[in-house]
């Protein structure tokens, strides 16, 4: 019970067991909601925009990482799939 006397695994300042603080993360903002011009430019032919949301292996980056809202993530995925089907974006990179 020696840990309880010293504050236990959780320190008095909110540190966790391994010294990490319970910090609040900065909320990600949807780039398409913030910039309407970018949303208007979202098209399967605009490979420069679509490449930002695809990994180097050809996978679509999930919205929890990019910060896009659900509405725009679905639209983005639709345009990426269109671009892949006509050959502007690769399905996978070897």
Curated annotation (Swiss-Prot):
GO annotations of cellular component type: cytosolic small ribosomal subunit
Keywords of the record: Ribonucleoprotein, Ribosomal protein, RNA-binding, rRNA-binding
GO biological processes: translation
Presence of keyword Membrane: no
Signal peptide positions (record): none
Keyword Ribonucleoprotein: yes
Pfam family, one: Ribosomal_S18
A molecular-function term among this protein's GO annotations: small ribosomal subunit rRNA binding
Subunit structure: Part of the 30S ribosomal subunit. Forms a tight heterodimer with protein bS6.
PANTHER family: 30S RIBOSOMAL PROTEIN S18, SMALL RIBOSOMAL SUBUNIT PROTEIN BS18M
Function: Binds as a heterodimer with protein bS6 to the central domain of the 16S rRNA, where it helps stabilize the platform of the 30S subunit.
Family per similarity comment: Belongs to the bacterial ribosomal protein bS18 family.
Protein name according to UniProt: Small ribosomal subunit protein bS18
